[in-house]
Structures are given as structure tokens and as C-alpha cells.
Amino acid sequence: MSTGNLQLYLSGHGSIDLLYENSLPEITLGGSGHPTSYSVVFEHSLKASVVDRALLEVGIRASSMEIPRWKISFNDVVLTREFKPLICVETSNGFFCKLVFDVTPIVTSKQKREHRVEIEYIGVKEFTLDHIGLLMLGSYEAARSLYGFWSGAISLQPGSSVDITLPQRFDHAKARIVAYLPHTDASLVVGTDSGTTVISRSTGMNEFTVELEDVSYLRLEHQGSGGYYPKEVLVSSILVYKIEIPEPSIEVSYNLDNSNVELNISNNGSDAAENVVVVSIAVGNVIDRKVLGELKPGQSQTVALSIKQGSTNTIRVIWKHRGKTMFKDIKVKS
């Protein structure tokens, strides 16, 4: 059987950029010999000049629903000192509980690129902090997006399933699913109108990305023998989205000159590549490194790097876009 539910918090379409970042620490707080706090910093990489909505979610596993003497802070603002979860589902070894906060006023009060979440707990009864997620949306004229976001708690026994009806049809979209698998023998099967994807060989709380075709619903099913403890697959959140947004396109050409390689690095895309760095690597060692900084659309830079003679060298160009690190490798031999 399945228990619990996921609540649809946000859905829509239009010129909207979105960011969804997760921290999945699976760290035990409280009790004897465990830490009393955990913090994480999320980087704000939205292209939108103003954040329209921001949601913070926290998921924990505990043996009891009584968790006194704890505190959740966001950007040094205390959100709560009481344990009042939105939902708790019972598992074979306790409870899985979720809390969701609208932190839009805090985010918009100060224009910051970093957002800090801190959880403090000095209670006797320990609990496991599994999931901290931050979703932010903002208007951005160059973006075209379609999205739906669910958060809550679902417990799936072996053989049980739950259906999620999407607010509209999605075509060639992605689903980001945060879920807990108790054992490598347990699988989470994601079914849609157009096929199934099996998530397996994973344990603990993880984020999984599933490519979707033409879909109007998701069916989440726990497949497994149940010969493991705990028995339940837990689902914490789902983001289904399709987004079209300007991106950088990095091209690299080179000329060899004895123990050096001269590189021409250009951005032929429609958005800037940030924090561009180029390194040369040979036999597992970094031979040389140069920092280029930002490379705007249409820009190019020429840089010389030292390489190891007589060896195959990897020239790696690294950059960031929307908070994600990307890279391109080319092989050269002097």
C-alpha cells in the first residue's frame, strides 16, 4: 500500500526561469555523539532580476514525531523553533516528515546570490536530516518554460504505486525526483503515457532525473521483494519541467608549438559562459592553468598553455552557466 501525498505547490508556463537545488546530507542530528547542527549554502544563479517565488523544503526521518529544541534558519532569519511538519508518513522504523516554507519575502528583501539554510537541534532523540531543497522562480523574457512542482511525503510498500496527474501535458520534458531507496534490491519504476524508466541500484536519499516524452501523468511504483529493512521507498518531491533558455556554446581550436599549445576559445552561443578556466593535464597531473573569467556571446580569447612533451595531454576548458559546471576536453600530443 501507499500512504501520504505530494502537494502541487507551483505550476505554470511562460517567460520564467527556475532554479531547483537540493542538499541530501542523510546526517544524524541530536542524541549522543552526533552533530547538533547542519548548514548548506545555495547559490542563486537565476537570470531573472527579481525572484517571484521561493520555496524551502526540509525532509527528515525520525523514530518519533516529537522533536523539541530545534530551529530552522534561512539567511539568518528564524523560520521556526517548533517541529510542525506539513505531513508525516509512517515507515517500518519510524516516520518520514516534510516541512515546506514560503521564503519569498526573505529572498526579495535583499538581493543576494547565496542563500544559507541552517538547522540546529540539541534534543535527546536523534533524527536523520535527509533533504533540504530550494526552488526559486523569476520572470525572464528570454526564457520559455513549462513546470509543475510537488512536495510532501509518500511511503511506498513493495508492489504499491501512486499516480501523479500533471497540471498539463508535457512533451520532451524532464522530471527531477527526490526519493529514498532502502536497498539496492528495491527499484522505483516511473511510468508514463509513453513508457517506463526503472531507477535501481541506489540506496539512500538521492535525486534522479528522468527524460519524459509526451506525458500527462506519472506513476511511481516500488518494485522489490521486501526482504530488506526498512521496506519503504520514500518520495519527497518532484519537479517536472521543460525550459528553453539562451546558453553558451564553447568552441576550441589550437596550434602546437614545442612544449606549448596556443588555444583560441570562443563563445558561439547566446549567453555568457562564466568563470572560464583552461587547464592542461598529462599523466594525471595538472601541467598548467589559466583563468579567463567571463566569455560573452561572440567573444573569443587566445591563451598559451604549457604541455608535457612526449605525452598525450588533455586540454580541459571549464565554465559555469546557471550555477552548473560544464567542460570540454580535447586531446593533444606534442
Identify the function of each model-found stretch.
Residues 56, 276-281:
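Hydrophobic beta-strand segments
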Residues 185-186, 282-287:
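Short aromatic-acidic-glycine turn motif
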Residues 1-253, 271, 291, 321-334:
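Disulfide-rich extracellular domains of secreted proteins
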Residues 36, 257-263:
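Short, solvent-exposed loop/turn segments enriched in Ser/Thr/Gly
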Residues 114-116, 217, 302, 312-316:
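Short, conserved beta-strand segments of beta-strand-rich sandwich/propeller modules, principally
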Residues 266-272:
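Short, acidic/polar linear motifs in exposed loop/turn regions
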Residues 285-312, 321:
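Intrinsically disordered, low-complexity Pro/Gly/Ser/Thr-rich segments with frequent PxxP/GP/PP motifs
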